[in-house]
């Protein structure tokens, strides 16, 4: 019986590249090489992705951030009819936007911690933010990180 050809895509073009390289390495180390033909795909740019994914039966996504979790690599894989790990195009794209994700969660009455989106260039009053959110505050970019 022919081995299933599995590609592990890691690296990528986001600021989370180094984490992605380690994540992908962990996936590769755990795959049974006697059962699967494993192809290590270190993504350095978007232009090589189609040729790198040729002749694969399945893809493990070890990518993080931009072009990894934002729906774009998922769209490429779907256009090539290659099954992959993780969420689909729409859910990946929506979940990369923290503010939209929180609004969707709130819309379905799912409990979530208070949040506040502050956009670049907007004036804000730190004391009012602390009073609204309370206690310790974690600041993160809306997408990535």
Where are these regions (language model features)?
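ATP-grasp fold ATP-binding core
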Residues: 105-106, 130-145
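ATP-binding N-terminal substructure of ATP-dependent carboxylate-amine bond-forming enzymes
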Residues: 1-90, 94-96, 100, 107, ...
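Basic phosphate/pyrophosphate-binding loop/patch that engages nucleotide-derived ligands
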Residues: 104-112
């Amino acid at each position: 019986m022919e081995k299933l050809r599995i590609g592990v895509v890691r690296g990528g073009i986001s600021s989370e590249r180094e984490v992605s390289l380690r994540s992908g390495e962990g996936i590769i180390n755990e795959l049974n090489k006697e059962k699967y033909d494993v192809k290590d795909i270190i993504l350095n740019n978007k232009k090589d992705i189609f040729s790198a994914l040729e002749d694969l039966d399945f893809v493990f996504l070890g990518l993080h951030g931009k072009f990894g979790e934002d729906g774009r690599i998922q769209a490429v894989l779907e256009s090539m009819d290659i099954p992959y790990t993780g969420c689909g195009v729409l859910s990946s794209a929506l979940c990369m936007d923290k503010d939209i994700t929180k609004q969707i969660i709130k819309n379905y009455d799912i409990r979530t911690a208070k949040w506040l989106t502050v956009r670049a260039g907007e004036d804000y009053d730190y004391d009012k933010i602390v009073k609204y959110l309370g206690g310790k505050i974690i600041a993160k970019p809306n997408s990535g990180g």
